[in-house]
Design a protein with these regions (language model features):
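N-terminal FAD cofactor-binding segment of flavoenzymes
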Residues: 68-106
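Short beta-strand to alpha-helix junction loop
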Residues: 118-139, 262-267
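FAD/FMN-dependent oxidoreductases across multiple families
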Residues: 93, 260-344, 350, 354-360
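N-terminal Rossmann-fold NAD(P) dinucleotide-binding loop
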Residues: 42-43
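Predominantly flavin-linked oxidoreductase catalytic cores and closely associated redox partners
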Residues: 140-282
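C-terminal helical "tail/cap" subdomain of flavin- and related membrane-associated enzymes
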Residues: 4, 10, 343-450
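Glycine-rich FAD pyrophosphate-binding loop
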Residues: 50-69
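Beta1/beta-strand and adjacent pyrophosphate-binding region of the FAD-binding site
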Residues: 25-39
């Protein structure tokens, strides 16, 4: 099901910049907007701003295609892809994703189908190879008129006395250069270029984790229409993802306490397999698995920046905040914030007096969505959440609201947000009931080793 993207976004109503205005701007700056980073967030912002007639230059540290995790999109990505004009191309390279499933202690899995989401808009998403997906978006930004420079590392961003910024960078050959811009959008992801330079980045003390992951062939898929599901398995000290990709490949990874990962002895591929197989159900699906390429490991520390923007600059996606990816929120939050940022920057360049108000509203909305995901993330491995996910009930449409959250509908849908408040109450009541019931023999979590 597709819906009109204009129903979900504040469309840009103003006209393109006039020739006289552009001529005056050209005298002072090399470009109107400088975007740092060529991932989904950067490409989204660059596409939409270039389409509006602004001069956009994007600097990307690497050369595409390149490997990246974060391969599971959400249904709420679809209207953004449609707005960009790439939905059909993404569908062609992606694996159809109708649901997310969470295996229970009894070995059965519960499939949370997106077509049951409260206020359903789009009833599916796609699993994508990020190398293909990110390159597609970057090439589309070029086609829309953005000036793309790959293998270009940003070294510093300095405010100019006459307004705007001077961005110093260096190419792969070591040659230095600079570009002046009226506005800077930091879409550098976990590089957090401006967050680090301005001293804004703050680690979340309770959200410490690390990830190990790889691609495999021979991993069994869910039967029938569930074949494209993302599966999330619980471990005693973390969780496992399985994301089905094209050509029979399965992305498999584990997110665990970093202290557990420090216990590793021997090869990373063996450690990854042993960790994943710490869940009995995951072990069964990995019985015939063959690793494709080399496994990788990365720190997965959650953080946020103290500020989201200032005069002439703005953070989007992971450049502002990063949360545990258990609900596949990363690419959606990146692209959604980038689309909103494009609207904000367009309006600010036309009327700078609006910037403070627009940035305040932008941050309030993004923090609201991050807060909804974070509340569930912090409680995912608790006995209470395990009980509620294994025994879902749709009283007052609460289950449908949780599915809407899993679909990414965490910003503006009031019926969903109201019922998520009810879910929090149900969680508290369930926690009290479990405490009053007293200790009892713990059920098998089927997560023995990790």
């Amino acid at each position: 099901m597709r819906a009109d993207p204009n129903d979900r976004f504040d469309t840009l109503q103003s006209a393109r910049p006039t020739t006289d205005l552009r001529t005056e701007q050209n005298r002072h700056h090399d470009t109107d907007v400088l975007v740092i980073g060529g991932g989904p967030a950067g490409s989204t912002a660059a596409t939409l701003l270039a389409r509006q007639g602004w001069r956009v230059r994007l600097l990307e540290k690497e050369r595409h295609p390149r490997f990246h995790i974060g391969e599971s999109l959400l249904p709420m990505n679809l209207p953004i892809l449609e707005r960009l004009g790439v939905l059909e191309q993404v569908a062609a390279i992606g694996t159809y994703k109708p649901a997310a499933d969470f295996p229970g202690d009894d070995g059965e899995y519960r499939s949370f189908r997106f077509d049951r989401a409260l206020g359903r808009r789009d009833d599916h998403a796609y699993q994508v190879r990020r190398s293909e997906f990110d390159q597609l978006l970057l090439q589309h930004a070029t086609a829309e008129g953005a000036d793309i420079a790959e293998e270009m590392t940003v070294e510093s961003v300095e405010a100019r006395d006459d307004g705007g910024f001077r961005v110093s960078c260096r190419d792969a050959g070591g040659d230095a250069s600079s570009v002046s811009a009226r506005y800077v959008i930091d879409a550098s992801g976990r590089e957090t270029v401006l967050g680090r330079q301005f001293g804004l980045k703050q680690q979340h003390p309770r959200h410490r984790s690390a990830a190990i992951f790889g691609h495999y062939r021979g991993v069994s898929r869910r039967p029938g229409e569930d074949a494209g599901n993302i599966t999330i398995y619980r471990l005693a000290r973390g969780w496992v993802w399985m994301i089905p990709l094209a050509d029979g490949v399965m992305s498999v990874g584990a997110v665990c306490d970093p202290d557990f990962l420090k216990q590793r002895r021997g090869a990373l591929d063996r450690f990854l397999l042993d960790t994943v197989c710490g869940n009995a159900d995951a072990r069964e699906r990995m019985r015939d698995a063959e690793l494709v390429g080399e496994p990788q490991a990365t720190g997965n520390y959650s953080y946020a920046c103290r500020e989201i923007g200032g005069r002439g600059w703005l953070l989007v996606g992971d450049a502002y905040a990063f949360v545990d990816p258990i609900f596949s929120s990363g690419v959606f939050l990146a692209m959604d914030s980038a689309a909103r940022a494009a609207d904000l920057v367009d309006q600010t360049l036309r009327d700078p007096k609006q910037e403070t108000r627009l940035q305040r509203e932008y941050r309030r909305r993004l923090d609201r969505g991050l807060g909804e995901f974070t509340w569930f993330i912090e409680r995912f491995n608790t006995p209470v959440m395990r009980e509620l996910f294994q025994n879902p009930r749709n009283t007052w449409q609460v289950e449908q609201a949780v599915i809407a959250m899993l679909a990414g509908d965490v910003f503006d849908n009031r019926p969903v947000l109201k019922r998520l408040r009810v879910f929090r109450l149900i969680y508290a009541i369930t926690a009290l009931r479990l405490r009053l019931r007293g200790p009892r023999k713990a059920p098998s979590t089927r997560a023995e080793a990790a």
